[in-house]
Amino acid sequence: MPIGRALAAGTLALLAAPALALEPPVNAGAAFLEAFEAACVPQRQSFEGTKANAVAEGWVAVGDDHHPELAALLEKSRAEMTDPDYPEWHGILAPYAQDIDGRPPYLIVLHFIAPGTANYIGCYLYDFDALDVIDPQLVTAFTGNPIARQSDQDGVKSYLWGPPPGLPGTGDVYLAHIADDSTTVAITGFSGLAIKFDTYEPGSGKGD
């Protein structure tokens, strides 16, 4: 089981398609990206630190049943993190909610523990009600990298940027929007907007 397939599985699948030129998005999304940066960047190398930082930024811990798409996403993610070939590998998911500019996004912080290889902390922000992807140039400015891959197929717009040079240990940054009628919803458990990155945990292997 490859590391990172848990919450990333659906998004990675979106980015496997050939690169296509995309039209400018309707939603500029600065507030969404700012919320992601504020919650995910400062303590990204620590699971407990990221959770504490999220609370300091106004996020409130919620249960799986806070939103049906959150419940479906978490259920699928937990299933992806269970593999009989790697019984010691496991993940801990911490979901949070907050109102941002009148919208109800959800933050998920992941601690994936993989003895024998490397642990990582994932930070994922979702807006299940978003109608379009945010302006990808905002993410280009955030990462300091050009878009490495993009696609627009089956109601899914997706983008990938390489590891941000200013964030040591952090991997690729993914951005995607999934339309309500996309067949990808059956894979991900949700429609709407998502942005994410994973950071290797210091002292656990790769990324030390």
Predicted segments with their positions:
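Bacterial N-terminal signal peptides that target proteins for export
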Residues: 1-10
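Primarily N-terminal secretory
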Residues: 12-14
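N-terminal signal peptide c-region/cleavage motif recognized by signal peptidases
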Residues: 16-18
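Terminal, regulation- and interaction-focused segments at domain boundaries
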Residues: 22-52, 112-136
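Accessory recognition modules or surfaces
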Residues: 22-33, 65-101, 105-107
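Short secondary-structure junctions
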Residues: 55-70, 75-85, 140-155
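Long, charged/polar, surface-exposed segments that mediate recognition or autoinhibition
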Residues: 87-161
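Glycine-rich, aromatic-bearing surface loops/beta-hairpins
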Residues: 139, 145-208
